[in-house]
A protein has these predicted regions:
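Single conserved hydrophobic/aromatic residue that forms the stacking wall/gate
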Residues: 1-8, 12
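Conserved PLP phosphate-binding loop immediately N-terminal to the Schiff-base lysine helix
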Residues: 13-34, 47
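Buried hydrophobic positions in well-ordered alpha/beta secondary-structure cores of metabolic enzymes
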Residues: 16, 42, 56-57, 87, ...
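Active-site PLP attachment segment
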Residues: 33, 37-67, 86-93
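Amphipathic alpha-helix from the class-I
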Residues: 63, 89-107, 119-121, 125, ...
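A short glycine-threonine-serine/GTX helix/turn-capping micro-motif
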Residues: 76-87
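PLP-dependent enzyme catalytic core of the Aspartate aminotransferase-like
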Residues: 101, 111, 179, 185-207
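Conserved PLP-binding catalytic core of the aspartate aminotransferase-like
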Residues: 110-117, 126-166, 187-190
Length: 207
């Protein structure tokens, strides 16, 4: 695998968890638990504060730090003390956010992620829905012109925006992207919420 090849070649692995981290997949980080990757560097943002305060960061493995410390190169250093880093309010928000996540929110996301994915796949019976894909509490519904041949809709139709407008009127916000509808529901979602989301999506797509 890529992971084993990287380890054998002493190549460092960097994992981007800006979207997948902090609960979206039911774990603080999805790299090891979901994707079976043990990275040397993880970049993260967004979910670390649940969006209540702008904050991003990096996590670095002990292996990488050890290699930096043992280097004889004159310029070997880990420069992490920057002018706008370690904002006290941002860090306080992140710490409290993680405390809340570890109080049942991660478990809820882990339990309901598969339910969310399964319910969304019921939309595949609609003529223009060509694909429903995702993992955990993040998903994408892709619309096509011909389900059988999976021909994409004309990009200038921006069908995702059309569906989003209908869904907004019914109480659901999507992220439209050309012919796709992207969803990242709250981590505190319940089964009734999932049913309502799928019902509104169905109505929005039909309209």
């Amino acid at each position: 695998t890529l992971s084993r090849s990287s380890a054998a070649s002493d190549v460092y692995k960097r994992q981007d968890e800006v979207v997948t981290g902090f609960g979206r997949m039911g774990h603080i980080f999805a790299s090891e638990k979901v994707f079976n990757i043990i990275p040397d560097i993880i970049t993260f943002a967004k979910g670390v504060t649940s969006g209540y305060f702008p904050l991003g960061g990096i996590a670095i493995s002990n292996k990488l730090i050890k290699n930096l410390r043992s280097s004889n190169h004159a310029d070997a250093m880990f420069g992490h003390g920057l002018t706008y880093s370690s904002h006290p309010i941002g860090c306080a928000v992140a710490i409290k956010n993680i405390e809340l996540m570890e109080n049942g929110i991660l478990e809820n996301a882990l339990e309901l992620g598969p339910v969310f994915q399964e319910k969304l796949k019921t939309l595949l019976d609609l003529p223009i829905v060509g694909d429903v894909r995702g993992q955990g509490l993040m998903a994408c519904i892709e619309c096509v012109a011909d389900y059988n041949e999976e021909n994409p809709l004309a990009l200038d139709l921006k069908v995702g925006e059309i569906i989003d407008k209908h869904c907004q009127k019914l109480g659901l916000l999507l992220r439209p992207a050309i012919n796709m509808c992207i969803l990242s529901p709250p981590l505190i979602i319940n089964k009734n919420d999932i049913d309502k989301i799928v019902s509104i999506l169905r109505q929005g797509i039909i309209q």
